Each structure stands twice: as structure tokens, then as C-alpha cells.
Design a protein with these regions (language model features):
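N-terminal edge beta-strand
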Residues: 9-39, 132-157
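Short edge beta-strand/loop segments characteristic of extracellular beta-sandwich folds
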Residues: 29, 41-50, 158-166, 179-181
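Beta-strand signatures of extracellular beta-sandwich domains
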Residues: 58-62, 190-195, 236
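Short acidic/polar inter-strand loop motif in beta-rich domains
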Residues: 103-112, 238-248
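Low-complexity, Pro/Ser/Thr- and charge-rich linker/hinge segments at domain boundaries
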Residues: 120-142, 254-255
């Protein structure tokens, strides 16, 4: 699968010995064996500067053996303070290699990969063959947001936000166990935006997460944010129909 990547993307499977390689190595934590392909967790971290002149612009997750290759593209900014991300997505049954690509503002794109075996696929409707049924309807509701009660000035704190929204690919797996066909319209969250700042009428856009129909149901996102001012933290999800779901917390720093 390395040949799939353009030569401009440098693949690092180990941290390396140079400062450049250590900074751009992507640490990926996920199960080697995933029993449920509808909910595969992944955590990504990098020991990379997150300063205005040198930071990680984005992280993308791909599985080339899946019918829907792109699992998400996640933009970051220096306001995050460090590079860390956890979420959950869907994969088809079988042996796969998950690729993570990070783009540095100075040094271009870097990648790493991890092997994963999925016991039961989660990219298609329930069942196989012409008689397959769409999964039961899932509820849609407001997201939930958690931040620490006490946040110090300059602290890089953890943000947890959980959506209440289903993901349906609209694909059906045929009886041969290999062929996917379109059997319905996808249902999914299309994006997540993170705003933070003292001015409610013009808040700073910190993150834009471009999401897909292979996200897990009711996904939980965990990522960092640097506390540099008092103000509103607001997270906005938008789904495939243009519906918006918002949640917010007031950030008040305490020494």
C-alpha cells in the first residue's frame, strides 16, 4: 500500500533518530483485532511544535481496502497547543492497513500505518444479499461537551465532545461477501467546527473536522485546546441535510 502514496509523502513506521523524524512521527493507538467494525477506536498523537510559524495543519485517516477509503480529515491550528485526536469509525471485515497522514506547515506531509483485523464489518446495511435490511433508525439529538472545571492560563486542556447522530453509508454487501452496491442514501455528520474566543460575534475558528458516512454512531471526539483567553468555546456539527447541532461552554481561567 506504500505505492499508493505520492512520493512527496514520507512514510515513517518508527520514530527515527533525527529531530525531524521524531517530530513528524505519528503515534497511532488502535486495536490489532477489532471485534465490531461499526466502532473502531483510534488515537493519534505527535510530539510536534504547535506554534504560528510551525505546526501540524491537518491529520487524515485512510483505509484503502474499504469501500469508503477516507475516514476523516481533521484540521488543526496553533491554538490547539499540541497534536492529539481520538475518535471512532467504521471498517469492513478483514485484514486492513490504516494509514494516517499529517501535514506540517514547514515540512510537508508525513504518514504512518497500522495493521488491523476486523471480525464483523460495519460499512454496510445489516445482513448480506438482496434481503439485507437497513439498520434500525437511530436518534438525533444535541451534542454533549466536557471540559475541566479548573483551567489555568496557558494550560493545554482536554476537550471531549460527543455527538448524538447516526452514520449510515447506504451501502449493501452482496452475497459474494466482496461487492458493495448503493442501496440507499447515506446519513451522516458532514463537519465539526470548533470556535473559541472572547468576542462572541467574531470567535476564532480553531478546528474544522471534515467527516464522512463511515464515522461511528454517536462518535466521541477528544482533542486539546490551549487556554489563552476567557470566552466561549462553541462546537458546531453539521449533517448531510445541513442541520446544525451546537454545544458551548464558557471558559473562565483561574490562576
Amino acid at each position: 500500500m506504500v505505492a499508493t502514496f505520492p512520493s512527496s509523502i514520507r512514510l515513517l513506521e518508527h520514530p527515527g533518530t533525527s529531530v525531524l523524524e521524531r517530530q513528524h512521527f505519528i503515534s497511532v493507538r488502535m486495536p490489532i483485532l477489532a471485534h465490531d467494525g461499526a466502532n473502531v477506536p483510534i488515537s493519534v498523537e505527535m510530539e510536534h511544535p504547535m506554534e504560528p510559524e510551525h505546526y501540524i495543519r491537518s491529520v487524515a485517516v485512510y483505509v484503502f481496502e474499504d469501500p469508503l477509503v477516507t475516514k476523516g480529515v481533521f484540521s488543526f491550528s496553533p491554538h490547539n497547543g499540541r497534536l492529539s485526536l481520538s475518535f471512532q469509525f467504521r471498517m469492513n471485515a478483514g485484514d486492513h492497513r490504516v494509514f494516517v497522514v499529517a501535514e506540517c506547515s514547514r515540512h510537508g506531509k508525513w504518514a504512518t500505518s497500522r495493521p488491523v483485523r476486523v471480525a464483523v464489518g460495519g460499512c454496510h446495511m445489516v445482513g448480506a444479499g438482496p434481503g439485507a435490511l437497513q439498520e434500525a433508525p437511530a436518534r438525533i439529538g444535541p451534542p454533549r461537551l466536557w471540559v475541566p472545571e479548573r483551567i489555568r492560563p496557558g494550560e493545554i486542556f482536554e476537550v471531549r465532545v460527543k455527538a448524538t447522530h447516526p452514520s449510515r453509508t447506504g451501502l449493501r454487501l452482496l452475497a459474494d461477501g466482496r461487492t458493495f452496491v448503493r442501496a440507499g442514501l447515506p446519513v451522516f455528520l458532514q463537519s465539526m467546527e470548533v470556535f473559541y474566543g472572547a468576542h462572541w460575534f467574531r470567535p476564532r475558528l480553531i478546528n474544522v473536522f471534515t467527516l464522512t458516512s463511515v464515522l461511528s454512531d454517536d462518535p466521541l471526539f477528544i482533542f486539546p485546546l490551549r487556554a489563552d483567553q476567557n470566552g466561549l468555546l462553541r462546537i458546531v456539527f453539521t449533517n448531510h441535510r445541513g442541520q446544525r447541532f451546537e454545544v458551548f461552554r464558557e471558559i473562565r481561567m483561574k490562576p
